[in-house]
Amino acid sequence: NFDISILNEFSKPPILTPHTGEFKRFFGNYYDSLCKKKVLTVREICKKFNIYLILKDVDIIIGTPKEEVIVIDNPNRLLSTAGSGDILCGLITGFISQGFSEIESILNAIKIFYTIGNFYLKNNYISYRITDFIDKISYWEDL
């Protein structure tokens, strides 16, 4: 099990990017609440633990330590491909390393993530190799 008390040891709010299964392992006591009231639960957890949370499910729910919540309701089953969450984390980290704020980094990364995912969806892909997804990052605006 994940020891959530470690979240209090960071000097800046950490960014977590769990899908719902990982969420259950991280925040088991909140899982039932999440199933009933996603937005409210994300808001509560982000405030309580001083974190950014990107909950990946059919939709994406982004929560901030300041209790802001953004829902991206643009389902794309192709974005659940193994490894795609790692790409999202890498994109976020890349933006942060360039000096963008956490929320700017998250939103920029999700924009790229969804643009590439939607390219695959619109072109009737049923799957893709994660390396092909990575290759598209350098020209995502042209997709």
Where do the protein language model's features map onto the residues?
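Glycine-rich phosphate/dinucleotide-binding loop and adjoining beta-alpha-beta core of small-molecule
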Residues: N1-D73
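A structural preference for long, well-packed, hydrophobic secondary-structure segments
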Residues: D3-E9, R77, S97-Q98, K111
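N-terminal loops that bind phosphate or other acidic moieties
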Residues: K12, F100, S138
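Short, small-residue alpha-helix embedded
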Residues: R25, T81-I112
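Short, charged, surface-exposed loops that flank catalytic or proteolytic processing sites
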Residues: D32-K37, G99-L107, Y125-I126
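Short pre-catalytic strand/loop immediately N-terminal to key active-site residues, enriched for Gly-Thr
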Residues: I70-G83
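Charged C-terminal helix
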Residues: T115-L143
